[in-house]
Structures are given as C-alpha cells and as structure tokens.
C-alpha cells in the first residue's frame, strides 16, 4: 500500500457528483496503460471519497447508485481509467522523460530509414520529436500512440516499419551457448538440427534490431555463425 504522503488524488465526475481515491501515481499510470496492477499496492486507503483532502467519504448507498457496486477496487479502477490522476509537476516531468525514452527506443528498434534500410540512431529520432513538437501521452502505452507519432515524424524523418527474416547456422561447438541466447533474444520461428551437430534456425525480428543480433552472434558463436537475410517484411 502506497503511503499517504506519496499518494495523489484520482478524480471522476459521475452522476453530477465527484468521487476521489488516493493512489500511487506510477501504478495508476500503469493501469491506464492497460497493465494489471495490485490494487492493495495502488491505493493509499481502501476508501472512496467525495473530498479526499477533507476526509469526506462517499456513502455505500451513493456508490451503489452511481457505480452499481460498493467494491472499492472496482470503483477505483473506473475512477482511474475514466477520470483524471492529479500528478505533481515533478512526477509529470519524470514520467514524460521515461515515456519519451521508451518511444525513441521503440522507433529505433522497429523502424528503418527506407533510403538506407538502416535504423535511425536514437539521437536523430529525439531531435525529430523536438522539431515536430510531438505530443506524448504519459498515460498511454508506447504501442497505443507510436503509429501516430511516426506519422507526425515522417515529414521530417523518413521512417518505415519493417521486419526481417534471417536464417542462422550455428556450428556444433557453439550450440549450447548460442541456442539459449537466441531464444532469450526472441523471434525464433523455426529450428532444425543437422547431422553434423550444427543447429539451424529462422528468426523474425524488427529490422532495427539486426545490429544487436549480429553483436550477440559474434559473442556466443565467436564470429563463426553463418547468417542470411531471407526477406524483408514491411
């Protein structure tokens, strides 16, 4: 449970009345992004208020009338998702910077410059975000807003969502370490063992992650892995 001194007010006007709960601002953000959260950790008090600052609680009858339930967790979910979370200016700056970094990283990994078929460096994406004056919603997930952001950036920065399908062959002496590393990396769609003990797989990854994959193969297969780009999808 978040402490009262770290909690902020989430407020919803419904049925002509205002209802408030005291919440952890970061868990409230996670809930708005569509993530599951523990409501015992989210709420500073398992109460629904008419005025949290005055400690004025909403009555059970009123909650049932307006929300159709007196379950505090269910009501808190509705207040957070449908209402407004009153975060501080410092919290907003912190959340905005974190979200900006997530968006830059996502765009760098999942898009390419169609002129070069290579990903844009994060610094270039960051400059384009500033130049385009893109609005970033701290309460939306990256996935929910990145397509609109990329659309806004395209007049400034050529971008294209693209994936690659890559065939990889690992020599027998490196399979133990390489296989687990590639599965942890993600994107293995097919695999096959060869009679000589080597291992072949096909991976599908965002094109922006190709460099990371090559770096990984260099480490786990000592530069002895064979790779071939089968196709680009996008």
Curated annotation (Swiss-Prot):
Gene3D superfamilies: 3.30.70.240, Ribosome maturation protein SBDS, N-terminal domain, SBDS protein C-terminal domain, subdomain 1. GO terms for biological process: cytosolic ribosome assembly. PROSITE patterns: UPF0023. NCBIfam families: RNA_SBDS. Belongs to the SDO1/SBDS family. This is Ribosome maturation protein SDO1 homolog.
């Amino acid at each position: 449970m978040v402490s009262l001194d770290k909690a902020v007010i989430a407020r919803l006007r419904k049925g002509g009345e205002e209802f408030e709960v005291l919440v952890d601002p970061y868990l409230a953000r996670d809930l708005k992004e569509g993530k599951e959260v523990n409501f015992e950790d989210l709420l500073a008090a398992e109460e629904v208020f008419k005025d949290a600052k005055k400690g004025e609680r909403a009555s059970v009858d009123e909650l049932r009338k307006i929300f159709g339930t007196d379950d505090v967790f269910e009501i808190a979910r509705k207040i957070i998702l449908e209402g407004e979370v009153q975060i501080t200016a410092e919290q907003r700056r912190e959340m905005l910077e974190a979200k900006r970094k997530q968006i830059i990283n996502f765009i760098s990994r999942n898009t390419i410059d169609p002129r070069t078929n290579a990903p844009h460096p994060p610094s270039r994406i960051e400059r384009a975000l500033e130049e385009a004056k893109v609005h970033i919603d701290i309460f939306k997930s990256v996935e929910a807003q990145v397509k609109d952001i990329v659309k806004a950036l395209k007049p400034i920065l050529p971008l294209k969502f693209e994936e690659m399908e890559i065939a990889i062959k690992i020599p027998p002496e490196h399979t133990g370490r390489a296989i687990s590393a590639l599965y942890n990396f993600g994107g293995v769609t097919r695999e096959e063992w060869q009679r000589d003990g080597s291992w072949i797989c096909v991976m599908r990854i965002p094109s922006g992650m190709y460099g990371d994959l090559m770096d990984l193969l260099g480490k786990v297969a000592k530069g002895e892995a064979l790779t071939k780009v089968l196709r680009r999808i996008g």
